[in-house]
Amino acid sequence: MGGPHGGPFLLFHVLCFLLTLSEVGSQNSKACALPCPPNSSCVNGTACRCAPGFISFSGEIFTDPLESCDDINECGPPSPVDCGSSADCQNTEGGYYCTCSPGYEPVSGAMIFRNESENTCRDVDECSSGQHQCHNSTVCFNTVGSYTCHCREGWEPKHGLKNKQKDTICKEISFPAWTAPPGIKSRSLSAFFERVQKMSRDFKPAMAKKSMQDLVGSVDDLLKNSGDLESLDQSSKHVTVTHLLSGLEQILRTLAKAMPKGSFTYRSLDNTELSLVVQEQGKGNVTVGQSHARMLLDWAVAAAAEESGPTVVGILSSQNMKKLLANASLKLDSEKLKETYKSPVRGAKVTLLSAVSSVFLSNTNTEKLDSNVSFAFALHEQPELKPRQELICAFWKKDSNGNGSWATTGCWKMGRGNGSITCQCSHLSSFAILMAHYDVEDPKLALITKVGLALSLACLLLCILTFLLVRPIQGSRTTVHLHLCICLFVGSAIFLAGIENEGGEVGTRCRLVAVLLHYCFLAAFCWMSLEGVELYFLVVRVFQGQGMRKLWLCLIGYGVPLIIVGISAGAYSKGYGREKFCWLNFEGGFLWSFVGPVTFIVLGNAIIFVITVWKLTQKFSEINPDIKKLKKARVLTITAIAQLFVLGCTWVFGLLLFNPESWVLSYIFSILNCLQGFFLFVLYCLLNKKVREEYRKWACMVAGNKYSEFATTTSGSGSSHNQTQALRPSESGM
């Protein structure tokens, strides 16, 4: 570089190089006939080619000046790029690269690579490395490529969160709040819930097993020594049992979540059994069994859709629940039963034959299951079924008022054998096996009853009008007959209009009807007893008695039944009204408030009539008997005995009318009831000569004919007149 010609020589060479480049560029520009888009190059001066990693719509080489070269997505399908497992492909402008998926790291240390052969990704254990973000209420569990946060044992996710998620936050399992049902006043129930509250305060998840055993024992004590629970009305009992069943299901479901995984069975001293299974949801079926019941269901049914974690399946079976379920109603499938028995079914009397088994699952949405659940319930009795009886699979259905009743919708009996009944149900609740005795309505009997009562009412009305309007027969015995017919008329009218309790609930209307029927029919028997007393004054007391005054007759005839009904209603007002009929309740011997007085009256009248017949026999055996007067007295006695027989027999069968098993006797009662008013009309009106004369007179007056009364010649002796006066012929007339 130090020679004299060095500088000019170097400058000359630089100028020559620049001129050469200018010439080459000029030649290339002149060689390409069209402008090429970005990411492309000219080919042979007439076309363009996209750079590697780009592609045009027309292909690799194109001549369209409007064409463009777009990036090829090597990571999208279809693509020959394979980064291998646990790796993700990342597309770039004109290329791509591979990286390990989240939760994985490269063993080689190279963060990017080109294909599967260079893949060295392996799982990262976030739990052991401390890279997790689990809350301190959870435990970290590593998974392939990730991790999950599980609630600690005895803990559950907070409301709105799920278990086994990265954001899971848990709280310690607590004893659910459970208080007494509102409106139920019972010392036994209050003491039970005080014990429950103490369990709640002392509860620890680690002691869940003991807490469940204590809870079952407390329920046994409540039901075994029910105390004042027995005195509750039927509706309150059913509200109580509904509250107990639903509360037990909720608490046992919650406490079971704190139990270790596996099976658990507990049997109390009172034969109440608790069986449950706690485990991760499996595939196929799960079976839970005990001596009272066995259950088979799909794991998918048992698991809760909104929760993840151990699944709970359990059964609690109690025999003591039947104390609160006595006389519980059964909701019937009326159309199906009508088709079966070819006649409407008004109701059913049920008998509990098994323990009451309550089912609880992790899944709380059990009103409509995806697959049916199978049950086998052990029977405590092996009944022989009679006509109109059936064994049914029933469940306890809660209504909107907190009450409940038995129902069969969604449950089917599959078979019977080996002392058990198998069932299938499409929902879950509390189940039991019932023997239902159906009350099948007999249309013929209903028609006979309605027509017969209408006929009886018509005849009784004629009797009442006759006793009021026919003056020749007025007297104390006619007064007795009048009020007897009035009582029977009012009672029969109420019976015809209001005896049926169609709603099923015993309300004020039904109780009032039962009270009125009780009073009217008791009053009828009281007036019948007064006729026996009248006969006693007439015949036994040497034919000189003048009978009882009307005031005393009314006080006794209406006052005595009023006292009996008043005492009965005051002592036990709930004894009036039944589920199907507005009549006296059979429970607790309340029916004796009617049967007792009626039995006493019938027996008393029978004794009076025996004495009367005996006295008449003595009179006939005298040396100079007054045959005419004795014959009339005998007629009165015979009619009174006939009346006692008809009324007494009618109500002997009438008491059986309300027993669904006595449908044959119900026919007898209906027929006798039809003849009751007709018999009194014939006996005291049509067979009475004076009444017939009045009827004939009225008929002629209506027809417009003049009535002629032919006087009969009688002996004018004073003795004959005195005898007639003594017997009060205006009342006999026969």
Curated annotation (Swiss-Prot):
Sugar-bearing residue positions: 39, 44, 115, 136, 285, 327, 372, 403, 418
Subcellular location per the Swiss-Prot or TrEMBL entry: Cell membrane
In what residue span(s) does the GAIN-B domain sit?
265-441
Transmembrane parts of this sequence:
450-470, 479-499, 520-540, 551-571, 594-614, 638-658, 663-683
Query: What is the predominant subcellular site recorded for this chain?
Result: membrane
Supply the InterPro entries for this chain. EGF-like_Ca-bd_dom, EGF-like_dom, EGF-type_Asp/Asn_hydroxyl_site, EGF_Ca-bd_CS, GAIN_B, GAIN_dom_sf, GPCR_2-like_7TM, GPCR_2_ADGRE2_ADGRE5
Q: Which UniProt key words apply to this protein?
A: Calcium, Cell adhesion, Cell membrane, Disulfide bond, EGF-like domain, G-protein coupled receptor, Glycoprotein, Membrane, Phosphoprotein, Receptor, Repeat, Secreted, Signal, Transducer, Transmembrane, Transmembrane helix
Give residues where Phosphoserine occurs: 715, 730, 732
The annotated topology with respect to the bilayer is: Multi-pass membrane protein
- Chain ranges on the Extracellular side, renumbered to this chain: 27-449, 500-519, 572-593, 659-662
Q: List the disulfide bonds.
A: 32-42, 36-48, 50-69, 75-89, 83-98, 100-121, 127-140, 134-149, 151-170, 393-423, 411-425
One GO-annotated biological process of the protein: cell adhesion
User: Could you name the Gene Ontology cellular component terms for this entry?
Assistant: extracellular region; plasma membrane
Domain of life according to the entry: Eukaryota
Q: Where is this region: GPS?
A: 393-441
- Record note on domains: The first two EGF domains mediate the interaction with DAF. A third tandemly arranged EGF domain is necessary for the structural integrity of the binding region.
Q: Member of which family? A: Belongs to the G-protein coupled receptor 2 family. LN-TM7 subfamily.
Q: Record's PANTHER family?
A: ADHESION G PROTEIN-COUPLED RECEPTOR E5 (PTHR12011:SF348), ADHESION G-PROTEIN COUPLED RECEPTOR (PTHR12011)
What is this protein called in UniProt?
Adhesion G protein-coupled receptor E5
